[in-house]
Amino acid sequence: MPGKLRVHELAKKLGITSKELLATLKEQGEFVKTASSTIEPPVVKKMQEHYQATGGAKPDTDNKPTPAKPAAKPGAPAPKPGTAQKPTAPTPGAVAAPKPGTAAAKPTPAKPAAPKPTAAKPAPAKPTAPKPATPAFSGPTPGDAAKKAAEDKATPKPGGEAPRPNAMPRPMAKPGPKPGARAPRVANNPFSTGAADRPGPRPGGGGPRPGGGPRPGGAPRPQGGQRSGAPRDGQGGPRGQRPGPGSGGPRPQGGNAAGAASQERQGGGRRPSPAMMPPTPGQMPAKAPGKGGRGGGQGGPGGGSGGFNRGGGGGAGRGGRRGGTAGAFGRPGGAPRRGRKSKRQKRNEYESMQAPNVIGGVRLPDGRGQTLRLARGASLSDFADKIGADAAALVQALFNLGEMVTATASVSDETLMLLGDEMNFKVEVVSPEDEDRELLESFDLQFGEDIGDEQDLAKRPPVVTVMGHVDHGKTRLLDTIRKANVGSGEAGGITQGIGAYQVKVEVEDDLRTITFLDTPGHEAFTAMRARGAKSTDIAVLVVAADDGVMPQTIEAINHAKAADVPIVVAVNKIDKPDASPEKIRGQLTEYGLVPEEYGGDTIFVDISAKQGTNIDELLASVCLTADAELDLVANPDMDAQGVAIEAHLDRGRGPVATVIVQRGTLRVGDSIVVGDTYGRVRRMVDEYGRDVDEAGPSRPVQVQGLNGVPGAGDNLLVVEDDRIARQIANQRNARKRNALAARSRKRVSLEDLDSVLKETSVLNLILKGDNAGSVEALEEALLKIEMDDEVELNIIDRGVGAVTQTNVTLAAASNAVIIAFNVRAEGKATEEANAEGVDIRYYTIIYRAIEEVEAALKGMLKPIYEEREVGKAEIRAIFKASAIGLIAGCMVEEGKVRRNATARIIRDGNVIASNAKIESLRREKDDVTEVSAGYECGMVLSYPDIAVGDKIEVFEMVEVPRDS
């Protein structure tokens, strides 16, 4: 069948019911919802093998020849009368022969006989009881048993005519096409009516059935009877006591379901299990006797007669109700018994009782130390999918742990680990590098390795990064090498972006190509310097001979060492009078850079970038280091891989990324993905603005055609087509968004909820810059500003390019300030900003932007007030006025007393009023604003409980400037 099978289709194919197949799937650990659910091919194969191994429908069809199928209907009662003992004498042996191993273990004659010694009255009626002992011989095969059964069916049996109407009216119509599959289940159908649902005879199941007479009390039960270990008690009467001989004569095959099931098993059929048909109260046999069933002929619901059991009595029968499952699985009838539990159910129950995992009334799964890998910024829904739990339960559990999180919100790493610890899960947050590698592997891509053999590799030019402190001459050095002037065009004379150049220089009469990267030296550009160190082969550390080792010099050394990049030191400005190259060598020795002349392995070159002194010697040292210490090779024939060292938004060209190809060849028209952006290479230009059709290893080019501005430092990868590039970029973008949301989300616990809800001063900023590196550096520098908890800096948006109307609209809605770094407002953005009252600040030097933002944050701080004493007075007399109240007659002892001032009232050294107001102040009969020391006055205080002798201290709160 094409496609996946559904449950009901597989059940039909196997010849079983969908309910039975669903139960088996659940027992095997395959959880399928409904009969219309699809099943994977491995599960289909597993079920087929399961039913073949347990003797299911398929093997039965092999063991039952075609002639036996039509004979099953009329022959069902034939083998069971008392007169059929002679022709079917060997049949019990045939029944037991297919299971010689179980003949001794299960149908042990001693166990069934032991509980029934009281049945001594019917002793003479079982002369054939010893015959089932014949299973000791090998016995005929199931095929022989089928032949014998067919012969028995062909012979008319007088005793079998009576029960025929109830024997097989319905079930054999179903198992007709697949008798081996349907026959055992029909006997177990609790919704059948009487013995009509009992299966027909099995191959080898035509053995003699005892008559209705009583059985000897100590006689062993025949082999084809019920299962071992459980005696057959009548389904209404007490165990071992039968009302008497069966009133209906010998029972047909359907009378004892246990016998039928046993014959089916011994005849090659599958073995039913209680888990396949869980008993329900409607299927259980009743404890109270029924109204009396037909002796033997009524089947399972009767008084327990039929098969190898004695005929049922009227008092013990249950013929009036629908068929039960007594004896269906080889167990006796009687009181209902709970179905057996699987080992998995028992183990799960035991483990849940041993260590219940309940958090705040929510029951959660126990991880038992299992390791979970979650992406950074994952939500509780992602967590719940991993462990198979309900996301709402995790939300409630986390709320009880003091964290308020929604099911779909990105959660911080600490919160994920906290929740994992509570459930005994070990949560591992996947690093961005591992996450990106797994993403590329899902598309059969990899980054960072050359593809091909060694003969495919070719030499490539070295990539050299010029690093050092600000104003130490890095850009001037590159200008001298390139014979150009770049530094004069930079704002403030400092480099605020990475410049990439490829120059051809003559070194020892050999024309060499070297790629140079110029990194910023200002402290705000730490990330740029680190990125430049990771993208390079050799680092040239420029140190001014007149300035010495500075903080950014040390930082550049650490970046180069972290990237495991060899360092060549260029001691610049040796032409200045106060230059001291030897001092520089001594200082750098402390940081592990020991000159060769001191016995170390670091090359030091004294240069003057301004005068052009020793520039050739520096280039020769760079080439020598590249040849001696590095094996600079790459495969130029593979798909290009590289890194974006800078990116910006050009108004006429759109997003432009400056990339260095590390391996392979980048061509116009290639589909590329750079970080979370993608596109097709529309145009490439070199550092001189000339169009380039292809760029080989170590070649810096500017790429146009991306759908957005990538981040500085993002990897460039050529993929097969735009569809793959778009999928990779979208997944990266979603992960980046989740990680950013988790990082920016402030953890709010119930304990600090009150303080969070209090009004705080927030400065919202929108950052716009000329390139991605500048925006990144500005954002990091602003976030490093240390302020009190009273104010908060919130960067709500950042981007590359001019200030647009969209930025102004967002700023107006969020009451934000726009910081424009090396860009201007375009179009009607300025008019809209003026109309909306949006403040746009323009900067060209980064530290000025940092200083002004820091000053703005300080201005947003709540003012600090301190108490300043104004004067002191003493109450000398108290006057009463009906309209005013108490009037204090005072003498001003120090300073001044002002009207509406705040006063502190002290009595016997204790403050009785700390914040009283001077509501009225008079001198003689005149209202005055203040009274100086040495004068008397009358005042009315807001605090009425005053007395003669009280001291009044008048003070005021004065705002003081903040130090920080």
Curated annotation (Swiss-Prot):
| Biased composition, class Gly residues, residue ranges | 234-252, 290-333
Residues the entry annotates as binding GTP: 468-475, 518-522, 572-575
Region (G3) location? 518-521
Segments carrying the region annotation (G5) are 608-610
Q: Which GO terms describe its cellular component?
A: cytosol
List every stretch annotated G2: 493-497
Q: Which CDD domains match?
A: IF2_eIF5B, IF2_mtIF2_II, mtIF2_IVc
Principal cellular location given in the protein's record: cytoplasm
Q: What SMART domains would the database entry show?
A: RAS
Residue spans of biased composition, Basic and acidic residues class: 145-155
Question: Where is the region G4?
Answer: 572-575
UniProt keyword list: Cytoplasm, GTP-binding, Initiation factor, Nucleotide-binding, Protein biosynthesis
State the InterPro entries in the record: EF-G-like_DII, IF2_II, IF2_N, P-loop_NTPase, Small_GTP-bd, T_Tr_GTP-bd_dom, TF_IF2_bacterial-like, TIF_IF2
**Pfam families found in the cross-reference section:** EF-G_D2 (PF22042), GTP_EFTU (PF00009), IF-2 (PF11987), IF2_N (PF04760)
Q: Where in the cell is it found?
A: Cytoplasm
Q: Which residues form the tr-type G domain?
A: 459-631
- Source domain of life: Bacteria
Write out the biased-composition intervals (Pro residues): 124-133, 166-178
Q: From the UniProt entry, list the residue stretches annotated as the region Disordered.
A: 35-353
Q: Which GO terms describe its molecular function?
A: GTP binding; GTPase activity; translation initiation factor activity
Quote the protein name from its UniProt record: Translation initiation factor IF-2
Provenance organism: Corynebacterium efficiens (strain DSM 44549 / YS-314 / AJ 12310 / JCM 11189 / NBRC 100395)
